[in-house]
Regions:
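Beta/coil-rich, acidic/histidine-enriched accessory regions frequently appended to metallopeptidases
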Residues: 83, 536-672, 692-693
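Hydrophobic alpha-helical and helix-loop surface patches within well-folded domains
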Residues: 5, 23, 35, 39-52, ...
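Solvent-exposed beta-hairpin/edge-strand motifs
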Residues: 107-158, 259-262, 610-620
Length: 755
């Protein structure tokens, strides 16, 4: 009876303890500090994606076999009233419903309504410190809709029927007199509208006073179709100022009428240059289209000569643009205009233009704008995806920097490196979100963050690194990226403090991609995956999951731990050096280094180990060391005493606590290794069939029990060892001829060393 009870107890101990380790080997570990907040289950949990792939969006991250998106083609006219800052226009929108759903109404954006005194966006502008709204200007803002008609054509006869519509803040719902059928039906809607431009319109549009006349930078100027997609149907989030735009693709045909002394530049290609430029300007324009160097089309002297002249006549400028999501323009009598040829990888050409006042001229300022524009477009075209527009125009305005397809508005006072930075950034937006049409209103990091990331690469390339930035010290950025009051990057800009937008939408996502490229995937794998994402979703509407899935599938890595740490959560990183000990207390036999992950974020481990002779060895451990551990020990095959060990020596990870990153022989302790030779051997119990074998590897005592996987134990006292994972303790006698295996801190099973 006693023997049966003993065998049952031993079996129970093994079943409850050691069997929990089946199919996994526990690595060498040090005692886990109770202060660690790290949970490897949280970091590496399965099922990151809340839904499977669909017929429209593949689980691999590419558009599905049945992917669809709707289309909006625009015929637009605009007349500029310079005195009143008023734009009067018409828009004929051909909207094509490619969705599987029928429609009885459509939604449009009327974004100028942000500047209505009663708008929601105006109501939430703080008393001070905001870039949004009209900066306190009191004026009659907002779109004035004169009429909305549905246009039909039957046997050559055109009919216009008034449509019922309702305006709700910055959205307009138009009821269709006839239901729009699914999968290819279209409707033509004609809208007459006008509005007065704000002087400063949420830093995205405005009017700048210069000594030679006003500069009009015109955007969000016509009613634009909302996106109807497979994610949430109509996307009708209001324009509140902080979040930007989500728009359908289509072709544009635009006629802009302005005072005859104005130069007008636009997103598209000018198709009537002979009607608006004089013979000299036409000749210079032709030269610019074939020149790698900047060519003046309209000079500063010519601007000054015609400055502030009273003009009663007008010119109409005609522009066309294909497969774009928006169209913006600028107009002024104050514009100096210069240009140069853009060379694209396919052999096609585009045209770089710069329009700026004399106050901005000079080689230290906007005189280099076209050079910057050309370099930026050529770089991104070669590296990621070819530029798709016939013109790239940089306009000096009173915006800090704002992007539209083929045209950007940058600060008129910018110079040198600042001008390069804002020019390169705004033109980078022609890839994100102009070519890759993500939902800016919800996920600003998918355009601002991606763009800031590619800017870091182009700046390193430009003019042999003229404006190359130093490598980011991520230790210094760690607190900024992860402070407790910071929202997550997945938040909409409308759902975060305005002061946090720069961090969460620009710098943190950009930094995440830098870390992913340089420390996790490597440049080659990252660049292929990122380029594939651009190619797959060019002129389409990706979601965050489409990006995450593409990066994983092309790179061949499960990156859920990375997305969780950086994007979904606001997790901190704190890796630290735990203990150092020489194998058998002999520096010639190597050193065992133990590192610990103290906080929620998991990242790879990089250490520099410097020996007494001055030799430095770099050690890299993959992130998988944290996949089932809070603490990790490894052996470094050094042959002499260690002088210092530095964790993350390049400050390449956002480690929030540098205090535990450096160990030096002068200040740090070396843990004495327990000489394990006396414990090694095979142990038996004459009342049980199991044998227990103790072996040593790299200074770690390992335990093998018959028919059970090996595990390791750590010392917890004199001749006393424990495996917390197995739930077992081993108390050796002083002569080390045997031990008691302790189960549940109470039951003892004696074993004796075999002779």
């Amino acid at each position: 009876m006693k023997n049966i009870r003993f065998k049952a107890l031993l079996h129970l101990a093994l079943l409850l303890g050691v069997s929990s380790l089946w199919a996994q080997q526990v690595p060498a570990t040090a005692v886990i500090a109770p202060t660690s907040n790290y949970s490897y289950h949280d970091a590496f949990a399965p099922f990151f994606y809340s839904k499977n792939g669909t017929s429209t969006r593949s689980a691999s991250g590419q558009p599905g076999a049945e992917y669809w998106q709707n289309r909006a083609d625009y015929q637009l006219t605009a007349q500029l009233n310079e005195k009143n800052n008023e734009i009067v226009g018409t828009g004929i929108i051909t909207y094509t419903n490619n969705s599987p759903d029928k429609m009885s109404f459509v939604w449009m954006n009327v974004d100028q309504n942000l500047f209505d005194a009663d708008s929601r966006g105006n109501a939430i502008i703080p008393l001070t410190g905001s870039r949004n709204g009209a900066r306190g200007q009191i004026f009659d803002g907002g779109h004035k809709i004169k009429s909305v008609k549905v246009v039909t054509s039957t046997k050559g006869k055109v009919t216009e029927v008034d449509a019922k519509y309702v305006i709700i803040d910055t959205r307009m719902r138009v009821m269709l007199p006839q239901e729009l059928k699914a999968k290819g039906d279209s409707v033509k809607i004609k809208i007459e509208f006008s509005y007065i431009s704000p002087m400063e319109g949420s830093d995205r549009t405005g009017v700048l006073e210069t000594k030679n006349g006003k500069i009009f930078t015109i955007a969000q100027w016509y009613p634009r179709m909302c996106v109807y997609d497979d994610i949430q149907g109509w996307n009708v989030n209001p324009y509140l100022g902080a979040s930007e735009f989500y728009l359908e693709y289509g072709d544009f045909d635009v006629n802009i009428t302005a005072p005859s002394n104005h130069i007008v530049v636009c997103s598209g290609e000018l198709v009537n240059p002979t009607a608006v430029y004089n013979a000299v300007e036409q000749n210079r324009l032709a030269q610019a289209k074939k020149s790698d160097k900047t060519v003046f089309i309209r000079t500063a002297d010519e601007v000054s000569a015609g400055a502030n002249a009273s003009v009663s006549t007008t010119k109409t400028w005609h522009f066309k643009l294909k497969n774009a999501r928006d169209m913006s323009w600028a107009s002024s009598a104050a514009f100096i205009l210069d240009g140069a040829e853009i060379n694209l990888p396919s052999g096609k050409k585009s045209l770089a233009l710069s329009a700026y006042p004399v106050e901005s001229s000079g080689n230290e300022a906007w005189g280099r704008s076209t050079e910057f524009t050309k370099a930026s477009i050529e770089n991104y075209s070669k590296r990621w995806f070819e530029y798709s527009y016939p013109v790239a125009t940089n306009v000096a305005g009173n915006e800090g920097g704002m992007e539209y397809p083929g045209i950007v508005f940058c600060g008129w006072e910018a110079k040198g490196e600042d001008l390069w930075g804002v020019t390169d950034h705004e033109f980078g937006h022609n890839w994100f979100p102009m070519i890759v049409g993500s939902n800016e209103r919800l996920f600003a990091w998918m355009d601002e963050g991606f763009n800031t990331f590619i800017n870091s690469l182009s700046s390193a390339d430009f003019n042999n690194g003229e404006y190359k930035s130093e490598a980011i010290d991520f230790h210094k950025m760690a607190e900024t990226f992860t402070r407790p009051d910071l929202e997550t990057m997945m938040s909409s800009p409308d759902n975060m403090k305005e002061a946090n937008i720069g961090v969460l939408c620009y710098f943190k996502p950009s930094s995440a991609l830098i870390v992913l490229r340089e420390q996790v995937l490597g440049e080659e794998r990252f660049d292929l995956a990122f380029r594939t994402y651009v190619e797959r979703w060019a002129f389409k509407h990706p979601t965050p999951d489409d990006f995450f899935r593409t990066m994983e599938n092309v790179a061949g890595e499960d990156l859920s731990w990375f997305w969780r740490s950086w994007f979904v959560n606001n997790w901190r990183l704190d890796q630290g050096i735990n203990t150092i000990k020489y194998v058998k207390n002999d520096p010639k036999q190597g050193v065992v280094i133990t590192v610990e992950n103290f906080d929620k974020m998991a990242m790879p481990v990089v250490l520099d180990v410097k020996t007494k002779s001055g030799k430095v060895s770099r050690i890299k451990l993959p992130v998988e060391v944290w996949q089932k551990n809070k603490v990790w020990s490894f052996k470094h095959d050094s042959t002499e005493e260690i002088e210092s060990i530095t964790l993350d020596p390049d400050h390449a990870f956002p480690d929030n606590n540098e205090g535990n990153n450096i160990w030096t022989a002068a200040k740090g302790a070396i843990e004495k290794a327990i000489i394990l030779d006396g414990y090694l051997g095979t142990y038996s119990n004459d009342k049980a069939p199991a044998k227990i074998v103790f072996t040593e590897e790299n200074g770690v005592l390992n335990v093998e029990i018959t028919d059970y996987p090996q595990f390791s134990v750590v010392p917890i006292g004199k001749d006393f060892f424990e495996s917390k994972t197995a739930g077992l303790k081993f108390q050796f006698n002083e002569s080390k001829s045997g031990f008691d295996m302790i189960v549940n801190d109470s039951q003892k099973i004696p074993f004796t060393k075999d002779k």
